[in-house]
Each structure stands twice: as C-alpha cells, then as structure tokens.
Amino acid sequence: MLPPKHLSATKPKKSWAPNLYELDSDLTKEPDVIIGEGPTDSEFFHQRFRNLIYVEFVGPRKTLIKLRNLCLDWLQPETHTKEEIIELLVLEQYLTIIPEKLKPWVRAKKPENCEKLVTLLENYKEMYQPEDDNNSDVTSDDDMTRNRRESSPPHSVHSFSGDRDWDRRGRSRDMEPRDRWSHTRNPRSRMPQRDLSLPVVAKTSFEMDRDDDRDSRAYESRSQDAESYQNVVDLAEDRKPHNTIQDNMENYRKLLSLGVQLAEDDGHSHMTQGHSSRSKRSAYPSTSRGLKTMPEAKKSTHRRGICEDESSHGVIMEKFIKDVSRSSKSGRARESSDRSQRFPRMSDDNWKDISLNKRESVIQQRVYEGNAFRGGFRFNSTLVSRKRVLERKRRYHFDTDGKGSIHDQKACPRKKPFECGSEMRKAMSMSSLSSLSSPSFTESQPIDFGAMPYVCDECGRSFSVISEFVEHQIMHTRENLYEYGESFIHSVAVSEVQKSQVGGKRFECKDCGETFNKSAALAEHRKIHARGYLVECKNQECEEAFMPSPTFSELQKIYGKDKFYECRVCKETFLHSSALIEHQKIHFGDDKDNEREHERERERGETFRPSPALNEFQKMYGKEKMYECKVCGETFLHSSSLKEHQKIHTRGNPFENKGKVCEETFIPGQSLKKRQKTYNKEKLYDFTDGRDAFMQSSELSEHQKIHSRKNLFEGRGYEKSVIHSGPFTESQKSHTITRPLESDEDEKAFTISSNPYENQKIPTKENVYEAKSYERSVIHSLASVEAQKSHSVAGPSKPKVMAESTIQSFDAINHQRVRAGGNTSEGREYSRSVIHSLVASKPPRSHNGNELVESNEKGESSIYISDLNDKRQKIPARENPCEGGSKNRNYEDSVIQSVSRAKPQKSVPGEGSGEFKKDGEFSVPSSNVREYQKARAKKKYIEHRSNETSVIHSLPFGEQTFRPRGMLYECQECGECFAHSSDLTEHQKIHEREKPSGSRNYEWSVIRSLAPTDPQTSYAQEQYAKEQAWNKCKEFRQFFATSEDLNTNQKIYDQEKSHGEESQGENTDGEETHSEETHGQETIEDPVIQGSDMEDPQKDDPDDKIYECEDCGLGFVDLTDLTDHQKVHSRKCLVDSREYTHSVIHTHSISEYQRDYTGEQLYECPKCGESFIHSSFLFEHQRIHEQDQLYSMKGCDDGFIALLPMKPRRNRAAERNPALAGSAIRCLLCGQGFIHSSALNEHMRLHREDDLLEQSQMAEEAIIPGLALTEFQRSQTEERLFECAVCGESFINPAELADHVTVHKNEPYEYGSSYTHTSFLTEPLKGAIPFYECKDCGKSFIHSTVLTKHKELHLEEEEEDEAAAAAAAAAQEVEANVHVPQVVLRIQGSNVEAAEPEVEAAEPEVEAAEPEVEAAEPNGEAEGPDGEAAEPIGEAGQPNGEAEQPNGDADEPDGAGIEDPEERAEEPEGKAEEPEGDADEPDGVGIEDPEEGEDQEIQVEEPYYDCHECTETFTSSTAFGEHLKTHASMIIFEPANAFGECSGYIERASTSTGGANQADEKYFKCDVCGQLFNDRLSLARHQNTHTG
C-alpha cells in the first residue's frame, strides 16, 4: 500500500507543472535500479516518451535528444530484438483500438504483450458476459466499476501526495497529461470518465427510465465501489516494491488507469471550489468574456500544447470519437459531475469515506431532492467553497413567481427555472433542480455541468465561472426585454454564445413554444412577437417591467433609471438605439401620408422643411420596403432590387400605361440625406403670367442632386410642356416613363426620369412654353457626373395638331462622338429658340444614349433604346424629316447648337444667357471647345407644321455648376443669370467698377480667354464669327444639326465675320462668349447655327490627316500640333463698334474653377503679336527678338517688348490702378511706357493737376488687364491705404507694405521719378552670396582661393613696377582710392560727366526691353567733349549679357525700389555714374577699377553736364537730374552686331578735363558683363566666374 507519509493536500502545484529535466536527473541517480529492470522500466519510459512536453526555453535540439533517449529507454534495442520491439508497437496500437469501456480495466491489468492482452479480453468476455441481456449492462458496469476502484484510491492518494521524486517523475510527468487528456480528447465528450464508471451509467439510464428500484441499484453500486477499492488495496499490498523508485513506478502504473478520471476530477474540483492552488494550471481556463463556452478540454489542449494521449498511448482514434458520440449524453454529463466530487482534495484518512459516501450522496440525490450533497463534503475547505458558490447563486437569484429564493442551504444551488409554457422545458428544469450533476437538457447537452455551479434558468446551461454566467445572463436579459417592447441587437456575447451552442434546440420561445438551437435565432423570432406587442400597446402606457436579473441591474447602473432614446413620433423611450430602430418601423406607413402631404404643399407653393427630429427619425429606418416602382406599384427592400425590376419596364413598352397619371418616382436612398433630398428642400414659385418656375437657393441644388423632377405649372395665357432628360449613372437601370397624350385637349406631355443617386449633381429644369402667339423652346444640355452610362429620354410635347416628333438616339462611346442637338421652333408671329450649352468639367466615362421616340398622329409611339452596355456600338443619327408643309414661316429663329467634349474637361461652363429683352433678340452662349472632335452624325432635316416644337437634347457629360434658365440669381444690369450668389457677386463687380452710359444701345461683350493647363486641350472656335457663320441659306432654309455638316458649310463662310453685322455688334472668341443683341431690332434675324469643330483624335478617318488652322491657314499632321499652334491665336483684340463701346477681356482660372477669375493670363509679344499661355513661353520667344537690332515695332509709334517673369506675380500697384495692368504699363496721357509701376507712379505725379476722373475713364476704355477679373474688380473698390514713401507704390494692407519696405532698407537716397528698374530675363542669385574684393584692383571673386591667386599676380606686377617710379606712384593712388567708402564713391559718381547719367538711365530701359523709345541714340552718340562716344555702346552691350541673369526684379510684386548689385551705386535722381565699375559688374557693389577712381577724383574738380538729347549743358547735377526726368524713359541703345559683344571701341570713360590723357589706354572687356581689364590674364580669370 502507498505510504501515507507522502500524502499532502498542500503540494499539488508541483504536480501540475512537472519538472521534466529534474525528473531525468533523478532517474539518472540510480541507473542500475531503473535500466534493465524489465517491462516496468520500459513502460515507465514509454509513458514519459509519450507524454513529454515541449518546453520552449529548453530548446528544440535538447528536446529531440530527450525524445530519442526516452524512446531508446522504452524500446531498449540493446536488450530487445526487433520482434519484441514490433510487439511493443503493436501492443500500443491494440490498446488504442479496444472498446472504450474496456480500456480502464485493461490498463489496470497492464498487459506486457499482445498475447496477454488477448487473454485478458477473452477472460473479460467470459467473466462479465451476462446470461440475460437485461442485466448485461449493469453487470458489466459493476465489473468495470470494481476494476476501476481497484486503482482509484491509490490514485487519489498519490495524486496529492507521495515523495518528492515520485511526484515530479511519476505523476507529474505522466499522469498530469492524462489529467488533461480526458478534456482534450474531444470537445464534445467527457466520455472516458463516463465509461470508467459503468454503474453510474447504469444508474443514469435507470434514472431516465424512472425505475422504482433505483435506490437498490444505487446501494449495490456503493457496495461495488467499496469492493473495488479493497481490490485495489490488496493489489497494492501484494506487489512489494524493491525500492522507493520502484515503488513509485508501481504506484504510477496502478494510478495510470485512473489518470484521466482523476485528472478531470481534480480539475472539476478545482473549478467547483474556485480557489484551488492549481488555478493557474487548471484544465478549465476561464473565459470571462465573450461567453465562449468551447469545452474546456479543447481550450487546455490549445493553451498547453500537450500531446493528446489516450490515457497511456496519446493517440486519438476515430473510433474513440465515434464511441463518444454514441454514448449516453445524460450519463456522461452526470458521471462527470459525480466524478468531479468523488475525488476532492482531502487527507488520506478520509479516502475510503469519500469514495463510499459519494455514491451514497449521488443516490440520495434522486430520493431526497433537498439533500444534494448530504455526506459528500465533510471537509471544511470544500464546504466553504461550496457555500461561497451558493452565496453567489443566492445573491443573483430571484424567484420569478415572487416567492423568494427557493434555495435550501443543503440543496442544489439551482433556482426555479423560468416557465416558458413547454412541458419538456419544465421536465428538464425539474431534473436540474434534483441534482447538480444533472443538467436541464440531459439529452442534448454533452457538457459536464456538475463542476459548473452557475446554472442558467433560461436554457439550463451551467458555468463554472461567474463572469461567463453573467455574460450569458446578459444575453437572456436582452432577449427577455423584447417582451416589454424593447429590442436589442445581440452583442458579441450573443454571437459567441451561438458558436458555443452544442446540441439540439434548447432555446424555446415563451410565447409560441417554438424551440431554437441558437439564442440568436430565438432573439430574431421574438422580434416578431415584440412588434405585435408594440402594436397592441401602442396607445397604452406600458409599465416597464423590472427584470430581476443581475445583468439588468448592472445595466441600470450604467444607463440609470431613465432611458435615453425617445421616439419622436409616439414619445416612447428606449434604452438602446437599436430598440428605437425596431420600434420606428411601426411608423413607416405614416411616412407615405407625409409624402403625399408634402406633394400637396409643393403644389400650393409652400415650403416643406422637416424638423431635426424628423431627420433623426428618417435616419432610423431605411430597411423596410421603401423603394416602390411607380409603374406597377411593387415595393422593394433595396434599391438594387428596384433597379433590376425596372429593367422590365425599360425593355418593355413604356407607353402601355399611357392612360395613367404620371407621378414622380420616389426612390429614396438608404440614408437620411438621400431620403430628405427626395421630397424636401424645394421651394417652388409659380407665376400665373407664364414665367418660368424657380426653385430657390440651395434647395434647388440639394433637391436635384438626387433626381431631376419637373412640376407642371400652368399659366393663364400659356400652355406649358416639360421636357426632361435625366442623368443616370452607370448602374442605373430604372425605367423611364414616357406617356404620350391621349387626347388633343391634353396638351401637357412630359417625361419624368428618376434617379436615386445623390451624386447626380446636375439639376435641370426646363419649361417649354407653347402658346398660340408665342412659342419658346428652351433646350438644355444636361451634364451628368463622373461615370455615367445612362439613358437620356426626351419626350415630345404634343401640340393640338398631332405631329411626328423625332428624337434621335445614338449610343456614344467614351468621347461622345456626337454632341449635336438641334431645335427648331416655328410660331405664328414670332419664334424664339434659346439653347443653353453647358460644358461638363469632368472626364467623360460614360455613354450618351438618347431614346428614339417616334409618335404618330394617333398617339402611338415606339421607342428604341440603344444598348448602354455596348461601348463599341455606334449608331449614327438618322434622318427623319417631319412630314407636312410648313406654315406661318414669316418669322423664324433657329439656333442649332453642337456641344463638344474634351477628355480633361476642366473648363468652366458657360453662364446662362441673358433674358429676352425684345422681340427678335436672342442670346447664344457658345460652348467651350477644348479639343477638336469630328462628328459622326449625319445631316438632319427638320420641317415643321404650325405650332410644332421639336426638341433635341444634347448631352455633354461631366459636372456643371451653372444651371440653365432655372437660375435664381440674375444680374439686374445685364440680365445674365447665375446658379450661385457668389458668381453673381463676382459678376456684379463689373458693373460696380464701371457703369454703362445709360443708353440702351450699349451692351457688354465679355470675352473670356481660358488659359488651359493641359497640353492636350486646345482653343477651338477662336472667332465667334466663324462659330456663328450663316449656315442656313435663306433660299433653301437649310439647317445643320451636327458640327460635321456645320464645318462643311462653314468653309463657304470661312472669311466672314459675324461681328460685321452692325445690328449684332462684334464678338471675338474666347471660348465662351455671351452676346446680347441690341434693342430695337425690328426684324428677326436668320437662324444662327453655332458649330464647333468636333474632332476625336482617336476616331479620325484615315484620310483626314491634315489639320488646318482656321486663322492662318497652316496645316498640321498631328492634332496636338494644331492645338499648340492655336494657342497663339487664342487671344483676340477687341473691336469697338458703334453698338459696343465697352469691352472687357478677363480670364478664367482653371485651377480656381470659376470661384474667382484669378488665373494665368495670355502673354502677347508686342514685337510680333504672338500670344502665349504662359510667361515662360513668351520668355523663350523673346530671346529671338533680343538678337534683333531694333527693339521697337515697325508698325507702331510706341514700341515695346513686354519682358515677363517666369513666374509672374500679381502686381499690386497695377491692381490698384487699371492703367498699370497688363504686360505693358503705359501712361494714357502722354503714351509713355514703363516696365514697372513704380516708374509710372513717379511719372503720374506730373499729371496730378489733370482731371483724375477723366483719366480713369480713359484708362478703362483702353485697358487690357493681365490680371484676373475678380482681382481687377476688387482693385476698383478698395482704397489705396498704404503707400511706400520711397517709390510711391500703394498696398492694400500694412503687411504688404512692410514686406516692400525691406527692399529699400539700406538705400541711402530716395529714387527720383526718372528711375526705372532693370529687369533680367532670368532670376537673380538666390540669397546673399559673399564676394571677395581685391583691394588692389577692385575686382570681386566668389571664392577666397581665387582672390589669393589673384593677389599673387598683383605682387608680381608690383615687383615689375618697382623699376619705374611713376608706376609706383600710380599704384599708391590706386590703393588709396580703393579704400574709399562706397558712399563716397557714389557722391563722386554724382559729379560725373553728362553722358554717363544718360547711359545709366538708358541701361535699365534696355535691359527691360522697353520699346517705347523716342530719341534713341542710333550709335550711342551722346558723346562728351573727350571722346565718350564708345561709352554708350559699351553700356548697350549689357542687356545681352545681363539677359542671362535671373529674373531678379521682375519677380517682385511691383518691382519698385528693387535694385541689382550694380544699381546700388547709381544715382537715384538721374545723376551720372561710372558705368564700368558698378553698373557693369553684376556681382560687385560699389567696386571700381583703380583707374576709375583716379578718373573720378579728377572729375570732381571741374564738373559740367551735357544733355545729349537737347544738347543743353548744366553745371549743377541737381539741375541736370531734373532735366533728365523728361528723358528718363526714352533712351535706348542699339545692341551689338554679335550677341553679348560691344559694337564700338572700348576705352575708358573720362571727364572733359582728364579724359584726353587716358583715352588711348587699351582695355579688355568681358563679353558677358562688360567689365574692363588691363590685361588678358585678368580677363580670362574673370570670365571663369561666369562659366563656373
């Protein structure tokens, strides 16, 4: 028998985490005892081999070595033969496949080979095979119990005691994995434990049969338990161990058969007690969150990673799983619960007691329901743990009948189950009351509930951890709350419960008795009852029932007593928003009534503005059948289903339902915004005098984003027809309702298209008015958004006389080959046709399909819908002339418009035309053509009868923001309409700046020149005259509906100009021209057909390879070349006629997208007239003219070249003064031109005494602003508040002035009015670059090393000059002059001879390419008395050299007061200065040659100044400076014959007194900057600074 001294209840922690390697070291201490002992040792190592646990910190290699050693110890190849080894392996497999009920008994017998195993099995069959079948199971079970109990007590003892070595090696190493094996075998089973106790199985089955002799069988089972235990004790006494290790191994073998059982028992005991020291190693890890009640056995397998083993062999067989599935679920569950209490942790002297009394307690549970544990727990630790469990249960338990707790102190901690109306449920609940070991659903729950004291009353589930039980109760609480009108969406806990549900239908509906196997299904089912209950209790006050559940009280603690979610319709409150969502579905039917009320309000012109409460309510429900087909009335839950359904009506004949009243299709979206936009935010105004109907403000755009809907407004004097072409998206398959009229009396025909998508941002509102006296045909080109492959349906308006109307349909491909639409209208007296062309701004990704609808005189119609899905299908427009003679053709107006479309489509759409002013006046805004596209539509001839209207919709695709004719914001001055108030505000600045003279004959012609950024785009239709060429011959009345025919016809009128007509005025093309005809025209003009060249570069005919420029006749092979070429002609000059005296050219900014008109301008070369879209292009172009000898234009009195910066900045001063804007700034009084506004400001001071108002008007008449229109307009209204005191430039805010003042920070003098700034064609050097100046010669160098080498040359020269005393004296004077401060040098420069200031004054003008020269020196002949003729020529060479410098000053905002390094030495007021020293060097500031200093000292003595312009002489520099103000901007020099070279002989500039002495000295000049040097070596080294 096992020694009791090792028995201890406080030591099990070690057994749960065996130290395998310590065990190995212990085994190696006595190798003679272990190795070679025979089968005992072999079996021991076998178990260790099978149950070795991989320990990560040990490492894989050591683990492998360990496994190999254990295998060798087990098989012992040194002592065993191959046959014996094979026998061992076969025996292992045999033990695996034997029946489960025999395995414990066989393992207890420990067969050493296969023969012994077979003998045992045969003996078992003979011994336990019953004679009668009725008692076979009982007898077998008794025997199995007996055999099991032979090993159970020793196992119980040694599971908690034993010496230290045995505990580590034997039990911990081998049995502990078996502890977990029973749980890891199968997630569904506790099967091995059930089979270990066959009497328990018999008892369970007997209990299910409700046999009367249950008590007797229980007592028999108890006696068998005692007998089994005695057998085990005798067996242990018979086998005397040789030593301690052998004894431990023997005990291990005996306990091996009960390893699984004891392991589970111990685990269950731990979970039941809840405070076991082995909790960290428990086989039942707690899952407190998520209610994941995956069998704990499976969890332990995943967490521990143990090799699953079948008690002794660790191989999981399929047969075992099948046996588990076949086993009795109730017996398994109950058995496990019995076992969980059969072997609790207790002392050795109580072992026999617990083994006997446990069975007794289990039996008495069936008889005495109140004594579940009677004598089962005699030990304080267990009872304390159990009492704690019962306390928890009591704390959370409430009797649903209101009788209080039904828990007895000694009874099972189960509360009375919740009655659901099911007898089966009651029976299960009663069984759960009887015993802790019997779950409610004994047949369907294969989980061991005995060790789980927390039992759910709803479903009978048991839980071992309180947190899991609470989570589970939360789920039931949510389900139960449905009964009280509150619905919940089951949380993650419920979803986890669904995963853990095992077994049959265990969730039963309390209302109808239906059962479900998942709680989620039951929750969904209860929603049905909850909705019905809510309907019944809708108008009643239902008390909130208190659910006596701990989880509900927890919810109350979280949310409080008040519920937060209130139904705004019926004021019912809910705890969760999901409950409110479910509740609000009841009110869904009320919405339809509201919708009809909204329609009535709209008919009355009232405004419906839903409250925020309704908005929130509409957000809540979106899943009922909200999508109704207006054709057949069928409703759908999803919009996609409706789309699929509407295919049927689209493919069918939409005219079948022509007798029905056409209603608006209401297809709400799934969100609040989509839903709201369908029926609110519409404020319609109906005017009974026949005017258009409008939708106010943002309500129009919001409403029409979803769909385009037309409301019919009937006037007194007019009959109106709404023709609508709705945009659709790619997936739009909704039907289109086109209902012709049944009778002649009904003259209102309209087509309604519905579009449920929010991204349809293009509202279109068309009202076609038909009247006896007047007919208006308003046709809108609709644009859709992004990817649109849609239908576009046009329904003909039916006049009294039944007419045939043809609306051509074609399926356009990606580039929309055909963008042509035509409209002709004929009236009895006057016909007007207005076409709004709206160009889209996004790339076309869709097709344009127009349905071909033909209506005969009987009202019959047929429709041909192009296949929208076939991108390659090309259907040309067909000819379908209208039959019948034409009547009342006295006056006709026909405007046929073709709209082109480009790929990028980044242009802004044209604004709507002005309103009708007088009879015969019409406005035709031309479309913005970005790329040439060839039309593929054939010619269409349309003839009309009287009172007939034919409508052709032309659909360019893309996003547009200007709405045609439905625009609310109309300019009161010119009648132009805008979609947004901001656009109107920007537009009205034009009128604020300048008002017309008041005459009705003055009209504005606004030419917008678009500067594209995409090189693929082009400026087609440059001249508005060619777009409006007369394409209809009066004799034949021929109409052209497509641009292809129009282009053909335009060749005839290629040279005509539409502005030649005096009545129409003249408009030049800027891509978008709004022309409003003058008043007083008494006759109706002939039709104007504006056509745009529509050429698709990818769809060109193979023969069309030459693209001709319409302006100059040049031909190009590639369309892109023509596009680039036409940019030259894109900017047109204004033509002032008698009717149009004010013209404004402004630009649109593509990047700003029409919010403002600030953008890149077109830059025109004044030399040749060529225009460029970017200043860099003009910069490159003007380099050609820089090499010309003359800078002035031949045909102009004032010649100039506008040198523009690479990145032009807005000139603030130019913005303030309109006269300063543009590429050339000129004085409007005297015509004098300036490069920068600072010079002009100084010049304008001379004209202050003049009338400023008159000058401003003159400036505005001749202005060609280069800045954006909005910036220009803003400049007219803002006051010039901050003015620079140095240069006179004005700024809007002090910040700009502060930035500007920094330019003049270190300038000693104020600039005079004669100062003009020097501009470079390239940017100056960024930042301050240090210069190293040679004090000997005044030269500057970038690097100090170059200066050092340069000084060495001076040393050598000084050594050479020491021979001559005269040379040494001259060198000393040079040294003295070099150190003279820069300010002194400037003062000295003020006394320079008269020719030098003239040269310096002319130098900036040459470099800035000022063409306005009045008295240019042809050869630089402003010669002084001492031979200074070459000096101006030397200076004239500077522009060529300095042209390579960066754009320094031109980049400044206004260029005022900014000077280059050499200009720092200039006299601001026109005083003369040395050109070589400072002006010639771009790097040096105030640096001069030694000789120059000497000259200046001499010049100070006898100064006098000669003016080369008027040959006047001055002795005072101030007087001479004032005189030069009149010539400041008029001096220019001819360039050299060669680029960068001087054309004259270079000699030193000198004064009249000292010039003759040094006139013969020879110098070497730098070709780049013009600096002079004494020797070639110095020149070569200097030139290295330019080359880098």
UniProtKB/Swiss-Prot annotation:
GO CC terms: cytoplasm; nucleus
Stretches assigned to the SCAN box domain: 46-128
Descriptive protein name: Paternally-expressed gene 3 protein
Sequence repeats: 1397-1403, 1404-1410, 1411-1417, 1418-1422, 1425-1429, 1432-1436, 1439-1443
GO molecular function, one term: zinc ion binding
First and last residues of each zinc finger (C2H2-type): 454-476, 507-529, 565-587, 627-649, 969-991, 1107-1129, 1163-1185, 1225-1247, 1282-1304, 1332-1354, 1505-1527, 1564-1586
Residue ranges, compositional bias (Basic and acidic residues): 143-152, 161-182, 206-225, 295-306, 588-607, 868-881, 1071-1082
Keyword vocabulary terms for this entry: Apoptosis, Cytoplasm, Metal-binding, Nucleus, Repeat, Zinc, Zinc-finger
Region (3 X 7 AA repeat of P-E-V-E-A-A-E): 1397-1417
Entry coiled-coil feature ranges: none
Cysteines joined through disulfide linkages: none
Disordered, as annotated region: 128-230, 266-306, 319-349, 588-610, 838-930, 1056-1104, 1395-1495
Family named by the database record: Belongs to the krueppel C2H2-type zinc-finger protein family.
Organism: Pan troglodytes
Subunit structure: Homodimer. Interacts with SIAH1A and SIAH2. Interacts with TRAF2.
Comment text on domains: The SCAN domain enables PEG3 homo- or heterodimerization to control gene expression in a combinatorial fashion.
SMART domains: SCAN (SM00431), ZnF_C2H2 (SM00355)
